[in-house]
Amino acid sequence: MQVTFLGTSSGVPTLNRNVSAMVLKPPQRSELWLFDCGEGTQHQFIRSNLKLSQIKKIFITHMHGDHIYGLPGLLASIGLAGSSSGIELYGPAPLKNFIDSCLYNSSSRLAYSLKFHRVENAANNKEILFEDSELEVKTAPLKHRIPSFAYRVNQKTRPGRFDIEKAKSKGIPPGPVYADLQRGEEVRLEDGRIFSGKEFCGPPRPGVSMVYCTDTVYTESAIEISRKADLLIHESTYSYKETEMAYERGHSTATMAAQIAAKANVDQLILTHLSPRYTPGNQTCPNDLLNEAKAIFPNTQLAKDFLQIDINKS
């Protein structure tokens, strides 16, 4: 599982940071999941090694402009390319009206299906938002000036590694039967012999997990959805010096993000959604936010546009 940051600034873009967007590449799939879509996100795709045509799911955290203004144009561009087989869009209830209105008033027609999923019920009732045989997505309400939601992607436990040489030594011919054995199933060969997949597989391999948490001030629900995640991506709009402003505006300081990471017992924290006031040369710069967080949670990294992170078990 890999994440790529396409926008790491809050509110407005800067010379080096675009507004919020992050891409998840699920393991062993030729598809991309986009989290938030601030203005200019499709330009960031062009500058990266990612393809718009591979987007299959889009998750929007909340309805502030720096998280959604890039979405209508991105959807229209995908339609013009004519290469999408359909997109699933997840977000707060007003998102559907926003997209429908933008497309209608610009006379834009999508050449693919766009299916919208409201997230409020899943968030408030702690239900699974999406699930297939390999992945599941959960969501939780955050604490912001308007309704805002965190997302967690869990990779399910996978079968242990298949010992091909052992299977060959037993005279099991290569082919589809290997896939059955790898799934732990029992198989019968043409000669009547029966084998259990458990004989040829190592211990089950736990999947990895990623949590995307923005915009929010410190809240227990952020801790709950982040518990024991391999990677927590959390907003860090302000320094601890602006704690009062953070509470007033519904944002987190680097200290708050680190406290959430520590209490949730995550493996790694990445800070994103930095206020444009923190630029190199100013009284407070991004590295100050990083050091602030690392004093509480040492395994912290600062996001920057086009940073790619592979999520692995520690």
UniProtKB/Swiss-Prot annotation:
Cofactor: Zn(2+)
Statement: the UniProt record of this protein carries the keyword Manganese: no
Pfam family, one: Lactamase_B
Active site: D66
Record-listed Zn(2+) 1 binding positions: H62, H64, H144, D215
Cofactor annotation comment: Binds 2 Zn(2+) ions.
SUPFAM superfamilies attached to this UniProt entry: Metallo-hydrolase/oxidoreductase
Function: Zinc phosphodiesterase, which displays some tRNA 3'-processing endonuclease activity. Probably involved in tRNA maturation, by removing a 3'-trailer from precursor tRNA.
Organism of origin: Prochlorococcus marinus (strain NATL2A)
Protein's name according to its UniProt entry: Ribonuclease Z
